[in-house]
Amino acid sequence: MKLRDYQIKLSDEGTEILKRKKIVCFFMEVRCGKTLTALQTCENVNAKRVLFITKIKAFSSIQWDYDQMNYRFNLTIINRESLHKIEGNNFDVVVIDEVHGYSSFPKPSKFHKDIKLRFGNIPMIMLSGTPTPESFSQFYHIFHLSNNSPFKHANFYKWAKDYVNVVIKNVGYAKVNDYSDAIKKDFWHLIRHHILTYTQKQAGFTTTVNEMILEVEMKPITYAIVKKLHKDLVVRSATTGKTIIADTGVKLQQKTHQLFSGTIKHEDGSIQIIDDSKAQFIKEKFDGYKIAIYYNFVAELKMLQNTFGNKLTTDLEEFNNSDKWIALQYQSGREGISLKKADHLIMFNIAFSAVTFWQSRDRMTTMDRKENTIFWIFSKRGIEERIYQTVQNKKDFTNSIFLKEYGIEKNRTADSNENNKQASQRRLALP
């Protein structure tokens, strides 16, 4: 195994930036080799101990890259939820994978605070294919992970006074400040010398992604529940006593999303599989192929496991070394892994996030693979097609879009208590 020419060039450039500025960002598109570029940079600066913060799903591939290259430094790979298990902070370099996951604003996340407190003085390598998927305002907290940030403002609000066009928005019955309109041209000169970018096109990728939408007729009960829920905002099972309540616009969106793929999470936290039509369709349609399946909700995984039995795994290493299918949740499986062994990528459901849409569909892309086929499994007359049309245009499927798509007035869900009392008297028999 050896580095590609552009990885050598990028790691050499990154080495100089890291030495001078203590922060280097490799903002490279998926499958361009961010991991190896970062590891080589650590080798170039003669690091002795390196901490690599990533998701559990990416552990094995990072370890494999490290082992293949016989690097001299000691590598510790960990997920951010387990940082408390590390004793001491004596690392020479900290690599933060998918750094956009720490870029929420206006307030930093708990994980952001943890990393800054413990490792803020250590040189950092930051990796992402989509550093600012929502707003250029995300740049502040990305760089503020380090105490060597080019932004000298003590907090986001002070930074926003200089670089953000703050807009007041009405949210429900309250007015809030919207900090998403950052003026990039005003601060780009401060950060551009920290950033190295590379695209799949520059790397020589010529992969064609073919997307096919396959529609599945769901069971009558699914359509009946959705219809009643949109009408009354509550559905109570006459057989189990379980209740589905959608007394806010967000809840109605979430419940509709769950139901059209055949599952529901009840108010008491329990989950129920109502309709396995999608899973049965996949079982019949893709028999004989090696597939990777993306799902959204825990109940969907349970349905897939019930349907496919021992044919299904959630372990990437087992998938790569057997004829089993793999099921991955969008949130944990969209970043940092490769599904190059899969014949097809199957999207059991679709997420509201545009970032998730674009990252997950690239999981099969490799330099020598010329064509990928992705199958979207949508319910007929369901919500999925509406989500798809939104996220493919790089926009999140927000609650306001949902309410507009379904012609629902915002104040209807907010003033639904009386509706719930009346509707609870009319029960629908769930499976």
Locations of the language-model features?
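Walker B catalytic acidic pair
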Residues: D97-V99
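N-terminal pre-P-loop "Q-motif" helix
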Residues: M1-K19
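SF2 helicase motor core recognition
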Residues: T35, L83-G88, S128-F136, A299-M303, ...
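A conserved SF2-helicase RecA2
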Residues: F352-W358, T365-P431
